[in-house]
Amino acid sequence: MNIFLSKFINNNIDKKGRVSVPANYRAVLGKEAFNGIIAYPSIRNNCIEACGISHIEKLRQMIESLDPYSEERDAFETIIFGEAVQLSFDGEGRVILPASLMQHAGIEDQVCFVGKGVIFEIWQPQNFKDYLASAQKLAHEKRLTLRNTN
């Protein structure tokens, strides 16, 4: 299955701004045309969203289905495409996180990777722990809305 699963807390960022992407995430991304990740500021949370180039293509198709002169389309294009960066893997599976994305997510010297299916998120570890508590509560409250459609 080609999805991003699991969380990895407290991955260190070195002095050059490099962080190692978890091996199982790299395995999913290895099937992509680009050897790296596409990263952009999350529009939902104070974190970085990342994915492969094929998911960016799906986002492009969804955004292009909107009215070309709508405020919504302009906002999505600006945030997702205008702020996105292609980050190539080095020989050790690391990427360099740009300062602008680190600042958006409040990241300094450690990150937490969180699999979200077709994307993964990169968080400041304490911010993720705080978010996880509220997400667990909401998931518990809304658990009956998740139904099998088969």
From Swiss-Prot:
Recorded hits in NCBIfam families, A to Z, give: PRK00326.2-1 (NF001475)
Q: Tell me where in this chain the SpoVT-AbrB domain is found.
A: 8-55, 84-127
Instruction: Write down the Pfam families for this protein, in alphabetical order.
Output: MraZ
UniProt family annotation: Belongs to the MraZ family.
Q: Where in the cell is it found?
A: Cytoplasm, Nucleoid
Q: Which gene encodes it?
A: mraZ
- What GO MF terms are annotated? DNA-binding transcription factor activity; transcription cis-regulatory region binding
Q: Does the keyword Transcription apply?
A: yes
* Gene3D superfamilies assigned to the protein according to its UniProt record, in alphabetical order: Transcriptional regulator MraZ domain (3.40.1550.20)
The record's SUPFAM superfamilies line, in alphabetical order, gives:
AbrB/MazE/MraZ-like (SSF89447)
Q: Which GO terms describe its cellular component?
A: cytoplasm; nucleoid
Q: Name one GO biological process term.
A: negative regulation of DNA-templated transcription initiation
**What is the originating organism of this protein?**
Rickettsia bellii (strain OSU 85-389)
Cysteines engaged in disulfide bonds, as pairs: none
User: Which UniProt keywords are present, listed alphabetically?
Assistant: Cytoplasm, DNA-binding, Repeat, Transcription, Transcription regulation
Keyword DNA-binding set for record: yes
Q: Which CDD domains match?
A: MraZ_C, MraZ_N
Q: What broad class describes the main subcellular location of this protein?
A: cytoplasm
* Name of the protein described by the UniProt record: Transcriptional regulator MraZ
Q: What interactions and quaternary structure are annotated?
A: Forms oligomers.
